[in-house]
Amino acid sequence: MMNHDTESHVKISRTIYRGVSPSTTRLESRVRELEDILDLERDARVRAERHAADLSYQVDALSERLDEAGGSTTQTQELLKRREMEINKLRKDLENANASLELAETSMRRRHQTALNELSLEVENLQKQKGKAEKDKSHLIMEVDNVLGQLDGALKAKQSAESKLEGLDSQLNRLKTLTDDLQRQLTELNNAKSRLTSENFELLHINQDYEAQILNYSKAKSSLESQVDDLKRSLDDESRNRFNLQAQLTSLQMDYDNLQAKYDEESEEASNLRNQVSKFNADIAALKSKFERELMSKTEEFEEMKRKLTMRITELEDVAERERLKAVSLEKLKTKLTLEIKDLQSEIESLSLENGELIRRAKSAESLASELQRRVDELTIEVNTLTSQNNQLESENMRLKSLVNDLTDKNNALERENRQMNDQVKELKSSLRDANRRLTDLEALRSQLEAERDNLASALHDAEEALRDMDQKYQASQAALNHLKSEMEQRLRERDEELESLRKSTTRTIEELTVTITEMEVKYKSELSRLKKRYESSIADLEIQLDATNKANANLMKENKNLAQRVKDLETFLDDERRLREAAENNLQITEHKRIQLANEVEELRSAMENLERLRKHAETELEETQSRVSELTIQVNTLSNDKRRLEGDIGVMQADMDDAINAKQAAEDRATRLNNEVLRLADELRQEQENYKHAEALRKQLEIEIREITVKLEEAEAFATREGRRMVQKLQARVRELEAEFDGESRRCKDALAQARKFERQYKELQTQAEDDRRMVLELQDLLDKTQMKMKAYKRQLEEMEEVSQITMNKYRKAQQQIEEAEHRADMAERTVTVRRVGPGGRAVSVARELSVTSNRGMRATSMM
């Protein structure tokens, strides 16, 4: 009997040790979980500190850039102010985040400390209960006198165990659903990871596109600078050419005036020569008639002298000889005069020919004068067209200024969008960290539930072992049952008190858990409202930006159409200019009655040239402004590249957070597999319990009558225990439902965050398309600038050709001037010869010959001038 009692005592102590071990394991697991949570909080704080250090470094870099670009323009000052405001906001956010992290860390430490204290109190209570249970079991070894009552209690315990098993089955089903949800979340997170990787690749491609765009902008900048230099040189050349043309026009006008005066003088001399020729012919006819009359009179006198003065033959012979000498001289004069008449006739014929040539030349000069007048009219039209083109260029310059301003505004908008995207990425990071914290909290609660389930399983195992021990010790306990009835009543009261104390402790722990849950709910709700407001504001800003970008795109399309129309107009203008140049080469002389108009037009051209010079200076100033703006744009592009690098770093941090979340989910899957194994173990234990139940029923039928009195008390105690157990189970079930609801809310939040990330991705793609449109616009503007440069080169070539033509005309003018000088020299020589010959007898004929030679020389001079 004593050996049997010692064996039963050893078995009871073993069962009690097994019943206490799950609580210690639960405490150890709780401590480990708390340590893991502390490690996670520390890692999060380290990451936050690193992020704060990165932000401070970025803030320092931005401040240096702001100091470097401080005195550029008012726009940069406004940008600096905005950036400083954003930096202050970021600093405040960092300080708030650090403060919130420190508060959360202190609150978590306090909670962990309180939880450890409560767990230590529970361990002490369990140790006390263990001692009391050992005492009770040592007494129960001697006091089991009515096994039927114990068997009834075992049956009721079985029923309660079955109800507990049903509750555990429901919990298992819920846990299975939770595991399925966790698996779904794992798949969703994997998909999100794949999306994030794809987004990372897309961001890398976008980065490359931005770098290519930056290179294109730099090339466009260099090409624009070269084009501006070419335009400046072409404008200078045009101004010089126009001054040269004005000087040539004035010289040509003076030459034309001189030629007109000479032409008038020559026409007067020709009329004088004609009058002299007519007079000379009349003199010749008079001389012929006179000489004939004199001969007739001489012959009559000679016959009368023969008839009347035969006596005076000697005198008459002398007179005859004299007359004969006179006749010889007259015949000589006659021959000379005939020769001179022939020469004069030939000279008259040559003069008539020269006169016809002069008439033809006068007609050609009149036609040239009409053509020059037409050219002057065309030049006036060209001047008007140039003024209109100048106005158009001024309007185009203003539009280009507006385009540059729009581009600067777009760059500012892109910078703001990049900042907003950075803020949104930071908010998403914080939301992911919060989600990770919530997952860790859920895992901790799950571990608590697992520990409670382990406790229940250990209690069931202890109950089974106690039933087995009671079955073995039934024979030894019958003698001591009567003696132990009164003691059992006292012990039952003590057990009731212990159950009440346990109930109070459990209610206290449940209240603390409810308080923590309410705090977490309030925190999550506040965070949700804050995130919702931020996302709504970001969505509104993005919609406004989309409207602005759409308007800008419409304006750019309109400007493209206007520029295409302008290109067509410029091409038509170039064709007109070429035609006018061809007409101008054929029309270089101007008539006299249009000379005043030409002078007025020349003055107008001078004023137009002055206006063009002023416009050129204005264009140079505007080009300098555009160069400064291009430099500002390059600075902004550099800032955008730095922001891109910062975004890449943030994406790397997000990927690390995603890897941590995936590892946590893998740990959750491992826990789910462990739960399944524990479910299988519980099923095996239920089978063993059913077998024991069959044995107990066989014994119960034999010992029903002996244990009715004790069964009443045991039923009351068991009813109390079942009521308390049901309450605990209901509370735990309610807690599990709340945790499930929180988990569903967290999953919905994750889905909303993913949807918002997709929205941001779409917005980023839209911004990328806008950037491509801007790049196309820049390329089109570059093409237009190239075309204008080609046109300016064509204008330059035309001006060079005009200069060559003007040089040719100047050479012709110089040759004509030399010929005129030679003709004047010849005229002077002829006048000298005439004065010399006038002294002699044939002065009149010599003067006529001189006049004819002068007219011939002047005709030759006119032909050389033509």
Curated annotation (Swiss-Prot):
Keyword Zinc: no
Record flagged with keyword Amino-acid biosynthesis: no
Role, per record: Paramyosin is a major structural component of many thick filaments isolated from invertebrate muscles.
Protein name as catalogued: Paramyosin
Compartment list: Cytoplasm, Myofibril
Coiled coil: 23-839
Domain of life: Eukaryota
Species: Schistosoma japonicum
Region ranges (Nonhelical region): 1-22, 840-866
Subunit and interaction comment: Homodimer.
Keywords, ordered alphabetically: Coiled coil, Cytoplasm, Disulfide bond, Motor protein, Muscle protein, Myosin, Thick filament
SUPFAM superfamilies named in the record: Myosin rod fragments, Tropomyosin
Cross-referenced InterPro entries: Myosin_tail, XRCC4-like_C
Chief site of localization: cytoplasm
Family as reported in the entry's similarity comment: Belongs to the paramyosin family.
Any one GO cellular component localisation term in the record: myofibril
